[in-house]
Amino acid sequence: MIKVKLLKNGNDLKKIVIKGHAMYDDFGKDIVCAAVSSTVITSVNACLSIDDKSISYEEGDGIVINVIKNDYVTSKIIDNMISNLFELEKAYPKNVQIKEENNE
């Protein structure tokens, strides 16, 4: 299962952690994993191409996105990414899980 954790401080999104494999199909044939990956990578690239200091990210056992700037454009791109991930969670609840944590 792909697990997405949205870490907020109040209303501000600070970090997104994405780990796991969807297990929808074999490696290389998994459309759910491909959808999550393309959504996330496209969003990361869009943020960085507009402002390379808007976010930072680390790849390893998954991907960790740190939101540095919550400006209008960055927020819209990240909100769109999250909306797409929620749609994938609705369509594939056995393969994608999203949790939100608030550290106010």
Model-derived regions, located:
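Short, conserved glycine- and acidic-residue-centered signature motifs
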Residues: V32-V36
